[in-house]
Amino acid sequence: MRLIIEPDYDKLSTWAADYVIERIHKAAPTAEKPFVLGLPTGSSPIGMYRELVKACKEGCISFRHVITFNMDEYVGLATEHPESYHSFMHRHLFDHIDILPQNIHILNGNAPDLTAECDAYERAIEAAGGIDLFIGGIGPDGHIAFNEPGSSLTSRTRIKTLTTDTVLANSRFFDNDTNQVPKRALTVGVGTIMDAREVMILVNGHTKARALREAVEGAVSQMWTITALQLHRQSIIVCDEAACVELKVGTYNYFKDIERNNL
C-alpha cells in the first residue's frame, strides 16, 4: 500500500487527477481496448473531477475510450433528483468531458428487480474486462462505497441498508433532513473493488482521521471495510495533512520519506 500525504485538499485533488491522467495515457486506450475506471461520489472526489474536466477541456486527456462504473446509487431516489448519483456524476464530470454516453454505467436504484440489477452490473464489469483503476472515498467509520461496518470483505454488488451514521453524514446533501435521505442503496461489494487491477482512495479532513489510521495501521476487519485495501496488490491512499492527525509519528514519517519524490 502507498500513502500519499498532500498539504491540503486542493493538492490532494490535483495529485489524484494527475494520476488518473497518467494511468489513462499509459494504457493508450482504443475502442477495442478501452480503459475501465471505477468512480465514486460524495465530497471527496469533487476537486479531482474539477481538475479532470479542466484537463479534458485543455486537450490534455480524452475520455472517448474510457468506460466508467460508479460505486453506488440510492434506492428509490429519482434519477433526475439533484442528489441522485446519476445527477451528481453528470453535474461534476460527465457533462463536461468527451466520454461516450454508452460508456457510462451507474446502478439503477429504481430497477423493478434490484437483485437482478446488481447481478447484471457484475456481469457488465466482467464483460468490460474488469476495472483498471477503481477510485473511492471512505466514511468516518471506514466504509468504502456503501459497504458499512460488518460487510463481508468478499461481498459483491448488492442492496445495503445504510447505518444511522451514514444517513446522518449524508443528510448534509438533503438540507440536513435525515427523513429525506434514502435508507437503502445499491453498492459494489468489497470483493468487487478488490478485483480491480488498481485501487486509489481519497481521504480528506480530520473527520476521516480515525478511518485513515485503521486503514493503514489497523488489523484487517469487516468492521472497517477500508482495511481490506491492505491485501490489495496495488493500492494507493491519497490524503491531506488534516486526515493524518491520528497516525503514529513513525508511520507518518515513513510514508513522507518514501514518497518524497512523488509529491
From Swiss-Prot:
Pathway: Amino-sugar metabolism; N-acetylneuraminate degradation; D-fructose 6-phosphate from N-acetylneuraminate: step 5/5. One of its GO terms (cellular component) is cytoplasm. Its EC number is 3.5.99.6. Allosterically activated by N-acetylglucosamine 6-phosphate (GlcNAc6P). It catalyses: alpha-D-glucosamine 6-phosphate + H2O = beta-D-fructose 6-phosphate + NH4(+). It is an enzyme of class 3 (hydrolase). CDD domains: GlcN6P_deaminase. It comes from the Bacteria. SUPFAM superfamilies: NagB/RpiA/CoA transferase-like (SSF100950). GO terms for biological process: carbohydrate metabolic process; glucosamine catabolic process; N-acetylglucosamine catabolic process; N-acetylneuraminate catabolic process. Keywords: Allosteric enzyme, Carbohydrate metabolism, Hydrolase. The record marks S151, R158, K160, T161, Y254 as: Part of the allosteric site. This is Glucosamine-6-phosphate deaminase.
